[in-house]
């Protein structure tokens, strides 16, 4: 929106042409989303509190969590609005990837909103039935996957890239590409959601990964940089740097309110949406394996749940004291802040490893 305006003004006043630079718009997007969330955040929290949209806490979890009952939830809607408004302001709205990312974010956000609302109304932690949640997630994930396959203009846009190895790629069939895309988007969505169980635990790693993906998107959309760094050139993918920067800015502002002790929780409306958004960006820029590495904390949390469920069903015994694994460490005696900060450190290390793949080939 603003890009179009500045382009029109730039025909007469050359100074406005500076807004054609993707890097400047990415920085402005991050600052815009940050500002919107900071300004609107307190009002949103007050409204959620007034409407008694509070979090239900599991009675079988760590006893220290019982004091969190009633804390406003569904605060992730603030992030989604900030990201959507900012992207519409600063991104090139003629870019299909921008709309794909936005629709994925908002689509998964709607699923999360329904899930959160059911929890509030029924005053329990179950929410939307799992079968319906996965049905709608799958529907959106498959639509995105088929769209990306149908619109791929170059073979490189559907190849699996092996990081840290020079020119190590595998061509994917339609079925393999669609399946991979589906699992990346739906898997990332649920992985972030499972991680969002402690104050600030999920949002800062999300900010870190989004920031890194902004760099990958910028490189992938630049013919010169992509060739130099050995990254698949995806025309138009650079605009996703605006979207990722908006996620990073909005997420950082949300952390202000979500840091321990949290004034508001993100809820499924935020966690499901942000995870799916990370997934779709990674697929577009062909960095699925790098996403897996950078989202190592999310992966660890998900695997802990899968292992716990499988072990209990097969042997009747639990591997962890409680899953997801952040609760296991709480029950071992770690303070909530210790778990959160240590997981943040792990995320930072993994994101740096992911970024190093740009040069280590």
UniProtKB/Swiss-Prot annotation:
Transmembrane regions listed in the UniProt entry: 25-45, 73-93, 97-117, 134-154, 168-188, 200-220, 237-257, 264-284, 289-309, 338-358
Gene Ontology molecular function: metal ion binding; phospho-N-acetylmuramoyl-pentapeptide-transferase activity; UDP-N-acetylmuramoyl-L-alanyl-D-glutamyl-meso-2,6-diaminopimelyl-D-alanyl-D-alanine:undecaprenyl-phosphate transferase activity
A GO CC term assigned to this protein in UniProt: plasma membrane
Pathway terms, separated by semicolons: Cell wall biogenesis; peptidoglycan biosynthesis
Main location (coarse class): membrane
EC number(s) recorded for this UniProt protein: 2.7.8.13
Membrane topology: Multi-pass membrane protein
UniProt xrefs under InterPro entries: Glycosyl_transferase_4, PNAcMuramoyl-5peptid_Trfase, PNAcMuramoyl-5peptid_Trfase_CS
Localization per record: Cell inner membrane
Superkingdom classification of source: Bacteria
Catalysed reactions listed for this entry: UDP-N-acetyl-alpha-D-muramoyl-L-alanyl-gamma-D-glutamyl-meso-2,6-diaminopimeloyl-D-alanyl-D-alanine + di-trans,octa-cis-undecaprenyl phosphate = di-trans,octa-cis-undecaprenyl diphospho-N-acetyl-alpha-D-muramoyl-L-alanyl-D-glutamyl-meso-2,6-diaminopimeloyl-D-alanyl-D-alanine + UMP
Job of this protein: Catalyzes the initial step of the lipid cycle reactions in the biosynthesis of the cell wall peptidoglycan: transfers peptidoglycan precursor phospho-MurNAc-pentapeptide from UDP-MurNAc-pentapeptide onto the lipid carrier undecaprenyl phosphate, yielding undecaprenyl-pyrophosphoryl-MurNAc-pentapeptide, known as lipid I.
Family: Belongs to the glycosyltransferase 4 family. MraY subfamily.
Identification of the protein by name: Phospho-N-acetylmuramoyl-pentapeptide-transferase
